[in-house]
Curated annotation (Swiss-Prot):
Signal peptide feature range: none
Region feature Disordered, mapped onto this chain: 136-250
Gene name, Swiss-Prot/TrEMBL: y1
Changes seen on gene knockout: Lack of this gene leads to loss of visible red pigments in pericarp of the seeds, glumes and mature leaves, all of which are white as a result. Leads to loss of flavan-4-ols production in developing seeds and loss of 3-deoxyanthocyanidins (3-DAs) in seeds at 24 days after anthesis (daa). A variegated pigmentation phenotype in seed pericarp and leaves is produced by an insertion of a transposon called candystripe1 (cs1) into this gene. Spontaneous excision of the transposon restores normal function of this gene.
Subcellular localization(s) per the UniProt record: Nucleus
Induction (UniProt): By inoculation with non-pathogenic fungus C.heterostrophus. Expressed as early as 3 hours post inoculation (hpi) and accumulates thereafter, with the highest expression 24 hpi.
Name recorded for this polypeptide: Transcription factor Y1
Keyword Transcription regulation among record annotations: yes
Function statement: Transcription factor involved in regulating the biosynthetic pathway of flavan-4-ol-derived red phlobaphene and red-brown 3-deoxyanthocyanidin (3-DA) pigments. Regulates transcription of chalcone synthase, chalcone isomerase, dihydroflavonol reductase and flavonoid 3'-hydroxylase genes required for the phlobaphene and 3-DA biosynthesis. Transcription of these genes is activated in mesocotyls in response to ingress of non-pathogenic fungus C.heterostrophus.
Keyword Repeat among UniProt keywords: yes
Matching InterPro entries: Homeodomain-like_sf, Myb-rel_proteinP/Y1_C, Myb_dom, Myb_TF_plants, SANT/Myb
Domain of life according to the entry: Eukaryota
Domain HTH myb-type stretches: 9-61, 62-116
Length: 383
């Protein structure tokens, strides 16, 4: 992109202009005028580029070009205009009749800039020296592309911008950072177990990470005597040694606290629970059925354990006592009243132990205290 070259620059002469070339160019312009600089070298018979011919004519061969060295007054004016306009050499040259912009630019770069920026030379103009700036030239030159103002550098501007951006980011981070808040990482939940280590944590509303990401480096508390072990009620804390950095084991203490809090929440809820109410209702119905049964303790035990009403020992004693009682009732004895009275009064009956055992067995029932304890357990909510 851009402007097309003025010529092919093939076979053209380069370097310094000779006196013969200056004479040919001056004669052609005096006869035909400046015209088109692209066609001028070919028409004039010069082996030069059109741009080279234009610069040679404007900067050296023109009749109104002021020759000679730049005076001290002109230096002062150049310095003041450069401080105001910057590197806008065409606009500066318009205030010097007979001086070209190229000449002023070369003089600034070769003499004035070195003296000002290297040696810090101060130019003091005469009291009667005044600089008059033509405002019409300033307005007309605004349409052109001007140079940079003195003291301005793209590198310095970018460096200042980077510095300001970095400082603003630092200030924002300081404002948003809540500070290194120390928080107990291995403390017990109750007040009876004091914290044994402190860890630096981020915001409390941050999402959960993996177990490895939740591990934090903690510092031992020198005031605690058992700080080397690092074990607390909530979870173990392992460390390298008593003085080195400690690491909190990747155990999820939050789940335990959440489970306990869930149980507390269930116990403190006023609304009934569907499953729990169903179990309690079924158990209460079974207890009511047991109390509604019309049975003695033997029947109650048989119904409870699914066995006979009497145990095996009681059955054997009753079977042994029945034949003896039958024999005593069926044998005829004429002296039965006297013998019975005498036997009852004086002689021990040989069947007395069996009868006593049978009577004791008949009156033997399950332990009342055991049944009361069983009833209490049955009515309780242990099951």
């Amino acid at each position: 992109m851009g402007r097309a070259p003025c010529c092919d620059k093939v076979g053209l002469k380069r370097g310094r202009w000779t006196a013969e070339e200056d004479q040919i160019l001056a004669n052609y312009i005096a006869e035909h005028g400046e015209g088109s600089w692209r066609s001028l070298p070919k028409n004039a018979g010069l082996l030069r580029c059109g741009k080279s011919c234009r610069l040679r004519w404007i900067n050296y061969l023109r009749a109104d070009v002021k020759r000679g060295n730049i005076s001290k007054e002109e230096e002062d004016i150049i310095i003041k205009l450069h401080a105001t306009l910057g590197n806008r050499w065409s606009l500066i040259a318009s205030h010097f009749p007979g001086r070209t912009d190229n000449e002023i630019k070369n003089y600034w770069n070769s003499h004035l800039s070195r003296q000002i920026h290297t040696y810090r030379r101060k130019y003091t103009a005469a009291p009667d020296t005044t600089v008059i700036i033509d405002m019409s030239k300033l307005h007309s030159a605004e349409k052109r592309r001007g140079g940079r103002t003195p003291g301005w550098s793209p590198k310095s501007s970018s460096a200042n911008t980077t510095t300001n951006t970095t400082s603003s980011k630092t200030n924002k981070s300081k404002e948003t950072d809540p500070g290194p808040g120390l928080k107990s990482a291995c403390d017990a939940k109750g007040a009876s177990s004091p914290p044994t280590a402190a860890t630096t944590t981020s915001a409390a509303s941050s999402p959960r990470h993996s177990d490895g990401a939740r591990s934090a480096v903690v510092d031992p508390d020198p005031n605690q005597p058992n700080s080397s072990s690092g074990s607390t009620a909530e979870g173990p804390c392992s460390g390298e040694d008593a003085t080195g950095p400690w690491e909190l084991d990747p155990i999820d203490l939050g789940d335990l606290w959440e489970a306990e809090s869930e149980i507390d929440a269930l116990m403190s809820m006023d609304a009934p629970l569907e499953g729990f109410d169903a179990v309690v209702g079924e158990a209460q119905a079974q207890v009511d059925d047991l109390f509604d049964m019309d049975m003695d303790w033997d029947g109650f035990a048989a119904h409870l354990w699914g066995g006979p009403e009497q145990n095996d020992h009681i059955a054997e004693l009753q079977q042994a006592a029945e034949p003896q009682a039958t024999a005593a009732a069926c044998t005829p004895n004429e002296h039965e009243p006297q013998v019975a009275a005498a036997a009852a009064a004086c002689t021990p009956d040989e069947h007395e132990p069996q009868a006593a055992a049978a009577a004791a067995a008949a009156t033997c029932t399950p332990d009342e205290h055991g049944l009361e304890a069983f009833e209490t357990w049955l009515l309780s909510d242990s099951f």
